[in-house]
Amino acid sequence: MYYPFVRKALFQLDPERAHEFTFQQLRRITGTPFEALVRQKVPAKPVNCMGLTFKNPLGLAAGLDKDGECIDALGAMGFGSIEIGTVTPRPQPGNDKPRLFRLVDAEGLINRMGFNNLGVDNLVENVKKAHYDGVLGINIGKNKDTPVEQGKDDYLICMEKIYAYAGYIAINISSPNTPGLRTLQYGEALDDLLTAIKNKQNDLQAMHHKYVPIAVKIAPDLSEDELIQVADSLVRHNIDGVIATNTTLDRSLVQGMKNCDQTGGLSGRPLQLKSTEIIRRLSLELNGRLPIIGVGGIDSVIAAREKIAAGASLVQIYSGFIFKGPPLIKEIVTHI
């Protein structure tokens, strides 16, 4: 397959520049006959989850296509679902560059992007142009300059604007790169947020005559007690699903490697065991009351199977996709 040669060239570039270059090419072909250049035929393996039918259990995790610019080109590669975002109500530049780092030996990434995106209105316009026939998730967050105490307002603004166009909505309260965001995972702050989100979901369902499920994305760095509390809150508020997990602040598996001390969230292979353990513990706690979407370090069929064995109904890839390319999609969907 050609991807090892493509990767070698891309890895000569700064990580963010490589991403920008790749997306520049994908934008050129998305929605055109040239999508055939990236199209892969993958077997149909339907999965019912959150009241939706997914063509296959493998999705693209949020963060790669933040603004929904390349939905059709990515869909042509065989993903059963694509999660775009994280998007915020207003455009924001994110954190200062450099903010994305490769740990090549560990096949990991560290990012401190900071929800750089062009805003929810721009994303909606891109979604309207897309023809992807899989499940489209839209991941939403708060603007950096919105006080945490008012953070729920940003989620509600985004929900209102994307509801008509989303297959499901992902609530990102677990990025380590927006100051104070992870505090929304705990106690009264979480209950307050989930109450507001559920009420808004009910209002929007009545308005649009369709039910769009809500999934909450959690961190891998939760303690046992925190995980129990999160699970309890999700069940009490009738949330439709949970995405486990986001990136980690833990560096124990990458000590001594180049870039290991960079600030930000670590993803890729070093996250695999940690995220799988969270899924296993979460699955025991939830006992089937809501489905888990497993993400974190999946870079092989074995890693995907481990997530499902731990309790995930669906899985997503991001860093593994960067390191292994489109062939990983076909490999996982075919053999999972």
Swiss-Prot record:
Q: How does it sit in the membrane?
A: Peripheral membrane protein
What residue intervals traverse the membrane? none
Q: Name one GO cellular component term.
A: cytoplasm
Cellular localization per UniProt: Cell membrane
- Which cofactors are required for activity? FMN
EC numbers listed for it are: 1.3.5.2
The record places the active site at: 175
One example GO MF annotation = dihydroorotate dehydrogenase (quinone) activity
What reaction gets catalysed by this protein? Answer: (S)-dihydroorotate + a quinone = orotate + a quinol
User: Keywords in UniProt for this one?
Assistant: Cell membrane, Flavoprotein, FMN, Membrane, Oxidoreductase, Pyrimidine biosynthesis
Classification via Pfam families: DHO_dh (PF01180)
Subunit structure and binding partners: Monomer.
The protein's matches in NCBIfam families, at most eight in alphabetical order, are given as: PRK05286.1-1, PRK05286.1-2, PRK05286.1-4, PRK05286.2-5, pyrD_sub2
This protein is called Dihydroorotate dehydrogenase (quinone)
Species of provenance: Shigella flexneri
